[in-house]
Structure formats: structure tokens, C-alpha cells
Curated annotation (Swiss-Prot):
The name this protein goes by in its record: Elongation factor 4
Positions with a binding annotation for GTP: D18, H19, G20, K21, S22, T23, N135, K136, I137, D138
Compartment annotation: Cell inner membrane
Gene Ontology BP term (one): positive regulation of translation
CC per GO annotation: plasma membrane
Keywords: Cell inner membrane, Cell membrane, GTP-binding, Hydrolase, Membrane, Nucleotide-binding, Protein biosynthesis
Family: Belongs to the TRAFAC class translation factor GTPase superfamily. Classic translation factor GTPase family. LepA subfamily.
PROSITE patterns, per database record: G_TR_1, G_TR_2
Primary role: Required for accurate and efficient protein synthesis under certain stress conditions. May act as a fidelity factor of the translation reaction, by catalyzing a one-codon backward translocation of tRNAs on improperly translocated ribosomes. Back-translocation proceeds from a post-translocation (POST) complex to a pre-translocation (PRE) complex, thus giving elongation factor G a second chance to translocate the tRNAs correctly. Binds to ribosomes in a GTP-dependent manner.
Enzyme class, spelled out: hydrolase
Amino acid sequence: MAEKNSHIRNFSIIAHIDHGKSTLADRLLEHTGTVTKREAQAQFLDNMELERERGITIKAQTVRMKYRAQDGRDYELNLIDTPGHVDFAYEVSRSMAACEGAILVVDATQGVEAQTLANVYQALDHDLEIVPVINKIDLPSADVEGVRQEIEEVIGLDAKDAVPASAKEGIGIGEILEQIVHRVPPPEGDPEAPLKAIVFDSWYDSYRGVVMLVRVFEGTVRPKQKIRLWSNRKEFEVQELGIFAPFAKAVGELQAGEVGVVVANVKDVHDAKVGDTITDAARPTEAPFPGFKVVKPMVFSGVFPIEAADYEQLRDALEKLSLNDSAFTYEPETSQALGFGFRCGYLGLLHMEIVQERLEREYQLALITTAPSVVYRVTDTTGAVEEIDNPAKLPPVQKIAKLEEPHLTCHIHARTEDVGAILKLCQERRGLQRDLKYLGTKRVQITYDIPLAEVVFDFFDKLKSVSRGYASLDYELKGYEEADLVKLDILINGEPVDALSVIVHRERAYQRGRDLCQRLREVIPKQMYEVAIQAAIGAKVIARETVKAFRKNVLAKCYGGDISRKRKLLEKQKEGKKRMKQVGSVEIPQEAFLAVLKVEE
């Protein structure tokens, strides 16, 4: 091992949402003098306004700190800040691959949560040295010993050296830094070997093109060097190298073991995929870094501008977003009801919310979003397999041999008193119980297989409400399973409205159709003629509601007199309404599309 690297430590921080990860990062930066008190602002590494507001970390960030340890040596610490949310699990695994150690932050008042566990298992898979920290000990409800036991029982880590700390009050920060220096191993790697580096994040800078965050494992990268990206064999010339300390500054080279920024004439962020391997074009390394995969979106929804004139603006906004987010996909789509728009793909629900919120906030767009749907796998009668992300594209019933839907394995951590309510919720969502184990006397871990389509709507909100906010959820994709699914069409006056169709389980179709029709009846305004709202599977109508017509009294000016005169007027009115119904089109208000989303309740 090169003696050169013995002063470098690469580590990340693992924590559940709100356990104080970003605050701890702020304190570490202040303690090492990387950021002066004047520059410090809360959640220093969460650059996006949205990240600060929701208190979550979305993109990975890095920062290099200089630290003089108690043994008098100077160390270079690279903190790689990872997103904690399960939607970004792949980004987390790539950030972990770039480290040798991790600080595990556990809230002294809450104990170990589902996402903490999921990330810890990933860290253990990457053989990281884990330094446990029990945070928020300044709170009156903190139970340090209890949490220490829980870390030992639930995760199986030896927690006798766990550092009690309070990131908010700055207690225990020095001790954490000492532990990093003494427990996390220095990186290995030979600066003379062929170049091998992993990209663990990339984003688009309007002046320099794509900026890649990399960790160099072998070799050295210098400006003017020709590099090659492994997954697509494209070659680029390195223009500049840099590090964040915490503001960007240029460096002359990055050697094995170091973490930094590479800018190399890359124009498209989709070329610099997270997890890809960079090597020297002239002297490539033997094998790429294992575990690279192209992230596939799991949840889809249509996004349409309310004003048709905003279409171009929406397209520009989506293009800019996708520059920074290689997991986000979009393609144009048209809908009879909503006009022109885009079909967007996301990693999960949080990702979807964030993208939509950024479109509305950063680009000031007013949007309609259709109900989220998942990717179904359809095998038709000829045996061809096709993946469908939009219910409107489903082939007719008689051509489908089998339909499969994605299933998730969900791990739910909860208090023992909420178990009943949670099991009931999972049962309602067609879940299949796999495991239930008690962690100590107060907490329980429940494992279920649940179809993704059932989780997409509001499973998370419901879970939080039945457990009074105490349950936490972590999930991974298990694979596709065959299910008895049907496409439910909504017809208005006999015309199908594509944006309202949904794919549902056959057992639920009747109930769902009835609910939908009732909802729509409330939101579609009255017309001069009656409007029929029907829910149908194929040609079979399973539910119907009618919006009654306005009634105009055409007989008001007939006093007494002959019945035939009155009949003539009534017939004439009836004719008029019939003609109107043939040519009239029903305006479907924005609320109708939202009604589809709310039907679940």
C-alpha cells in the first residue's frame, strides 16, 4: 500500500431522515475549520432550496476537510454526503462504493429505523468500517443506553465505543473525528497503475458541461489526459480537476484514494452515468467496477401544462431537469382530454413529488399530473412480451395472454402497539406476509410482499397515519408476478376519456368503478342535456352515474289550452336536447383528474 495514502480517510454518513445527518456534517466542517462561522449556514451541503426545505438530501455532495489529530499528524478527510431516501438507493450504493468507512447516526430518542438499517446493510456489503454515533443526547427524552443496546441487537454492531453526541450543541464532535482517523482504514491503490475511477454523481454546469464526482481507485488522472467511460466506450479529454473544500478549487492531479471533480468536455449527462468506471483511453484497466447498472424508472405519470402555450417551456424545463438527473426520463405524449404533454418516469414516489415540485417552483409552470402508474409486463397471444407504462396503451383484452405487475418487498419498522393496524393495511393492499420479528420489547420489523401499484398511491401516508408517524418503510423491487388485472375505462356520454383509465385488480374493479363514477358525478358540471358517466371493462359496463340536465320550462307561456300544443313544445325541446347531445362535448374540469387520485380513500 502506498505510504502516500496513509493520511487519507474517505467516509460517508448514514442516517434515517431527521436523525441529524446534515447538522452533523455542518459541525464537522466547522470543527475542522473548513467553513468559518461566517460562511456557515444550516445544512451546508444541501444546496438545493428544496433539499433544505424538506430536510432531505437528494444529490450526493462531497467535501474535503483538513484535520490535525491528537497524535499530531495531519489528515485529509473526504466526507461523501449520501441521500438517505429509499428512492435513491442506487445512488447511495455508489457513494458507499467510494468510501472505506461510514458514520452511523442514530437518534437517541427514536432508535434504529428502517432506512438506517437498509443503508447499514449496504455499507456492510461494501465492507465499510462503521463508526456508530448516538446523536441528540441533549434532548430530555434521549435514551442513550437503550439505543446502544438496540444497535447491538438489531444491527449486530458492537456499540460499546459508540460516541454519544449532539450535533446541534456541538458535543462529541472531536471524538467522532478521532474515531474516523483511528478506525476507518486508509484507501489502497497504486498511483502508477492504469487509471480506474468510479463516477458516483454527475450534474450539468451550463459553462463547463457535465461535472463528474469521482473516486480514484488506481492510477492518477491529470488535465489533458484522454479518458474513456466504460459503459459506452466514449472517449473525452480531461479539461480540469478540482476538489470541494467546501467551495470548488482546482487541483493539478487526482491520485489513487482521492475524491474529486473531473470536467471533460462531456456534453450529455446520460453519458456520465452514476456507477460507471473511468479509465485511461491509452492504457485501460482490465475490468470495470462491479455493480454498475442503468437505473430504470419504476413509476410513471403524465405531466401536462394547464395552458397549452406553456408546452415549449415545459419541454425546456424537463430537459434541464433531466440534465441533472439521469434517472428521470420523459417522452412526449398526447391525450384527447388534456392535449399535448409528457410521460415522465421516476424512481419512486418521493422522486416524483420532487420533480413536480421543482417544475412548479423553479420554472413557474402550472401543471396537471395524471395518476401515477407502474410498468406492467404484457404477454400477448403470439407470445411477444411488451412493457407498458400507460394504461391507455394496453392492448384489447382478447389479445392478452397474461399480465404481470411489479412486486416490492417492504420492510416496515414500527412500535409493537401498531402491529394490528399495519397488518390490516398491508392485507387491504393485497400484501403477502413474509416475516414478523420483534426487536426487543418495543419495536417490531414486519416484512411484506406488496404490488407496487398498491404502494404508489398513498400507502406511505396511510402507514404514517395508522402508526401515528412512528412506522418507517424501506422497500426493494422483488420482480414481476402474474396477476388478474383489467383495464377500467371511464366513458363520458359513450366516449372513453384516455386520461382517466386505470389498470386495477379484477376483484377491486367493480368497487373502484363505482367510486370513480360517483366522484366524477360530483365534479362534472351540469349541461343542458344529461351526461352519462360509465365505468367499463372492455365492452361490459360495470357502473353508471348520470349528471342530470338543467331543466327549462318551455310550457311557462301556455295557459290552459290544448294538450297537443304542449306536447309539440315538449317534443321540440327533446329533439333539441338530443341534437345538442350529439354535437356537444363535455368540458372535463381539472378536479376530475384529481378525483381519480383520491378514489383510494
